[in-house]
């Protein structure tokens, strides 16, 4: 017997090598040869298999040609997963009567290779293109990790891994250390200048992410490094497709800088968190954030493909009614079309990602006085904000009902917290109270105060979202309180809580003690918005799942100032 293992692809003249083996092999002897399999390399995007010492890359088609020229017959072929996919071929001399050529197996494999396109140069162009896609995801993610002030190290300084580091142009600027269990490598550097440290050194101060270069041993590494994963660390596997793995599922929060998102991040501690924001970058310790315009569909799909989230909590939207009124096309894109794009990406990719879409009670506001029911399709919209939100809401239901995807709408009623933007009424009022108490007696101008609002604290909304995405299937839920409050009464109470008692005369609210005007009510500020509304509901489904609001209106008002 003659064996040649993991070296056949290094030969400058493989036919002559085979003839030399023929010359030393017994008449009924066997030559066994094992090396990486070309089709496995192509299928798994193993660009790291291509390195300086490899001159050839074989499928059975090429090996059969070599065997024929050297007067060998192939008696068996076996495949395995070693190093990303290898095959072992067993040869016998053609004149041997002890072994027969396995024509049925050979023809079956050759047909599979030809059907795959092994004789067509396009498959190699496609291979490089696919590898470049995965490497770009890796490269971009490493950049994001560093922008977030987090740490990513290399795991396993292997030969193939060094090929990937060079191809992706990843060096010591991107990753401070490479972690290695082989003591002979510790203290040295990778080809791109990354210092190699031991595993125990890494465990004393573990990074947030480990880029696994020996990715072929994925399952063994996940088991071996369970402690790292359980402590919150995450693995990055570059191939066959870029993937981030942790012990927790991944949740992606769009609109990660918003008010509700702040409380979602506190609530979703059982997830590895990722965020998408559009404002000035704000990087945090408990979440990895991406900042870009989500209306760029190519960047959006690229980012989602990097994260491959188990859950998407879609909160991003234009929230200002005034801005939406003056920018209807932009509002339709941000609050409607963007939701549809997220649904479409998940569907086309074949993911089983759960989606929570932040819908709004504003989609029923045109009814003026209305009690919203569960699964209520009687939307009535008179404003660009609610028109766009209705579109997003409807697209979520379309993808859920037609394709059976786990997509949910949460119809969120008025949400308050101290983190709400100051342009919104109650926060505008509290800021005015602070100014008034500090001696600035300027008058506050507001719109109609006769509407009723069903008000929740943002933390209760976050808990509702967690309850919703914990369900196996998608649905539509009302996220609301059991009672509504007149806006006028809330404004009066806020001032009263801080010793400013107001009286009303016509459209003026003045301070009883001084007679100074405090508020001017402008009823016709925005046309139809001047009409008092009372949109209410009952969160029947959520309460059946055990959710209920925990923060009462007194606490909400108390937090605001």
Task: Annotate each PLM feature.
Residues 251-269:
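N-terminal Rossmann NAD(P)H-binding glycine-rich loop of SDR-like oxidoreductase domains
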Residues 433-561:
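C-terminal substrate-binding subdomain of Rossmann-fold SDR/epimerase-dehydratase oxidoreductases
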Residues 83-132:
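Flexible, glycine-/basic-rich loop-and-beta segments that form/coincide
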Residues 294-334:
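NAD(P)H-binding glycine-rich loop region in Rossmannoid oxidoreductase-like domains
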Residues 15-30:
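A short glycine-rich, Lys/Arg-flanked "PGG" loop and its adjoining helix->strand segment in the class I
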Residues 326-341, 354, 363-409, 416-422:
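Catalytic helix-loop patch of NAD(P)-dependent Rossmann-fold dehydrogenases
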Residues 33-56, 60-62:
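Short, glycine-/aromatic-enriched active-site segment of Class I SAM-dependent methyltransferases
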Residues 28-36, 234-238:
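Conserved beta-strand signature within the Rossmann-like core of class I S-adenosyl-L-methionine
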